[in-house]
C-alpha cells in the first residue's frame, strides 16, 4: 500500500485541463504529486521503488479515480534517477498518455522547496526536543523574502546532496555523501531484520543507544567540560559492541567446560544482548550526526546561516530532526539554523508538477 501524506489546499493552474502527474523515482522511494482537475488540492503518495510494478498500478489507479480514466488528457512529468531508468517502462505502461517528459532533478528540488517556503502556510518549521515544533511563517506573509537567501538544501534520500541556493533559479551542488537514508535502511535491515523503514524508525524512537554506543561518560566518568562535551555525548558509535564481544570471548575461553549448561548465556554473548531498538537508535544517531556535521561544514565554507533538510529520510521523525538540529546548533555554536518541512520527501516531485503547470502544452516526447 502507498504511504499517503497530508494533502494541501492550493489554487492550482489547470491550464488546458491537462491532468498533470508528477513523479520522482529515487533509489529507495517513488513519489507522486498531483491535483485532481478543478479541486484546488495537492495530493501526495509514496511507495518503495523496489515495488515499481505496484507504483505503475498506483499511477493507473490515480488516473482512473481522479481523471475519469482519461489517459489522452494526462501528462506525466518524471524526475529523479528513475526518470531515466524507468522511462521505457513508463511508455510501455501508458501508451495512450498525452505526454511523458523529464524534469532535471536538482532544479526540481529547488523549485519545490521555494514553493513550500513562499506559498504554503505551516509548512516550514524548526524542531528540537526542548522547544518542540515552531512553525515559520511563509515569506508571502510576515517573513522577509530577502532573509531567505542564500540557503543550503540538504536533500537526504538514499544518499545526500547539498545544494547552495543564492536566489530563485540560481543554485549549485556544493557537496554530498554516500552515507544517507539508504545506508541506514540497508544496515538496519541487515543487522536487525526489520522489514520497513517505518519499523526501524519506530524501534529507534523507543531505543537506548547507551547500551551500544561508547559515551563520553564511559571514558571520563563525567562531563568533559573543557571542550564542552556532556557525559551523554557519543564518543564512539557502536563502541560498546566490540568491547562486550571481547569480554564475552574471554568468558567463553575460561569456561569451556561449562558450555553444555550455559546455552542461554552463549546466545546472549553471541550478540543477543543488543536489542534491536537500541541498535536502530545508535545507527540513526551515527548517520544523522554525520549528515549534520557535513551540512554545518558546507554552511560555514559558503557563509550560509539557514539550512533546510529535505528528502524522505526524516519523515517527521522527532529523534531524527532533533539530532540534525542539535548537530547544527552544536557545531555552529547557535549561529546557524536547521529547518524542516511537512512534505520534505516531495520537493522534486513538487518542482516537476509546478514546471508542468507553467507549461501545460508540453507535447509527447521520446527523448
From Swiss-Prot:
SUPFAM superfamilies: Actin-like ATPase domain. Its main location: cytoplasm. It is found in: Cytoplasm; Nucleus. It catalyses: (R)-pantothenate + ATP = (R)-4'-phosphopantothenate + ADP + H(+). GO terms for biological process: coenzyme A biosynthetic process; ergosterol metabolic process. Regulated by feedback inhibition by malonyl-CoA. Pfam families: Fumble. Keywords: ATP-binding, Coenzyme A biosynthesis, Cytoplasm, Kinase, Nucleotide-binding, Nucleus, Transferase. One of its GO terms (cellular component) is cytosol. It comes from the Eukaryota. The keyword Cytoplasm applies. Present with 6190 molecules/cell in log phase SD medium. PANTHER family: 4'-PHOSPHOPANTETHEINE PHOSPHATASE (PTHR12280:SF20), PANTOTHENATE KINASE (PTHR12280). Belongs to the type II pantothenate kinase family. This is Pantothenate kinase CAB1.
Amino acid at each position: 500500500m502507498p504511504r499517503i501524506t497530508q494533502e494541501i489546499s492550493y489554487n492550482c493552474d489547470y491550464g488546458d485541463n491537462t491532468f498533470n502527474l508528477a513523479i520522482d523515482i529515487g533509489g529507495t522511494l517513488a513519489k507522486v504529486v498531483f491535483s485532481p482537475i478543478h479541486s484546488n488540492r495537492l495530493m501526495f503518495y509514496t511507495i518503495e521503488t523496489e515495488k515499481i510494478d505496484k507504483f505503475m498500478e498506483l499511477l493507473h489507479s490515480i488516473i482512473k479515480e481522479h481523471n475519469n480514466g482519461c489517459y489522452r488528457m494526462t501528462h506525466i512529468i518524471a524526475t529523479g534517477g528513475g526518470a531515466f531508468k524507468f522511462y521505457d517502462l513508463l511508455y510501455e505502461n501508458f501508451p495512450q498518455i498525452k505526454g511523458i517528459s523529464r524534469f532535471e532533478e536538482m532544479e526540481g528540488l529547488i523549485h519545490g522547496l521555494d514553493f513550500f517556503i513562499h506559498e504554503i502556510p505551516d509548512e516550514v518549521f524548526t524542531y528540537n526536543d526542548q522547544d518542540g515544533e515552531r512553525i515559520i511563517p511563509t515569506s508571502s506573509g510576515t517573513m522577509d523574502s530577502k532573509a531567505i537567501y542564500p540557503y543550503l538544501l540538504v536533500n537526504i534520500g538514499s544518499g545526500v546532496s547539498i545544494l547552495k541556493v543564492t536566489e530563485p533559479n540560481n543554485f549549485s551542488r556544493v557537496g554530498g555523501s554516500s552515507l544517507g537514508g539508504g545506508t541506514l535502511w540497508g544496515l538496519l535491515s541487515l543487522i536487525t531484520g526489520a522489514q520497513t523503514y517505518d519499523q526501524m524508525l519506530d524501534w529507534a524512537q523507543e531505543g537506548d543507544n547507551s547500551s551500544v554506543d561508547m559515551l563520553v561518560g564511559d571514558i571520563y566518568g563525567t562531563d568533559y567540560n573543557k571542550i564542552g562535551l556532556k557525559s551523554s555525548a557519543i564518543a564512539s558509535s557502536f563502541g560498546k559492541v566490540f568491547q562486550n564481544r571481547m569480554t564475552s570471548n574471554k568468558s567463553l575461553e575460561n569456561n569451556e567446560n561449562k558450555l553444555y549448561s550455559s546455552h542461554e548465556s552463549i546466545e546472549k554473548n553471541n550478540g543477543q544482548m543488543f536489542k534491536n531498538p537500541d541498535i536502530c537508535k545508535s545507527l540513526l544517531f551515527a548517520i544523522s550526526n554525520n549528515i549534520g556535521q557535513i551540512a554545518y561544514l558546507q554552511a560555514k565554507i559558503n557563509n550560509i546561516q539557514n539550512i533546510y533538510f529535505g528528502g524522505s529520510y526524516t519523515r517527521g521523525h522527532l529523534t531524527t530532526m532533533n539530532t540534525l538540529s542539535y548537530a547544527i546548533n552544536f557545531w555552529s555554536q547557535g549561529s546557524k539554523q536547521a529547518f524542516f518541512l511537512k512534505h520534505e520527501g516531495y520537493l522534486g516531485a513538487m518542482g516537476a508538477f509546478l514546471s508542468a503547470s507553467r507549461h501545460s502544452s508540453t507535447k509527447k516526447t521520446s527523448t
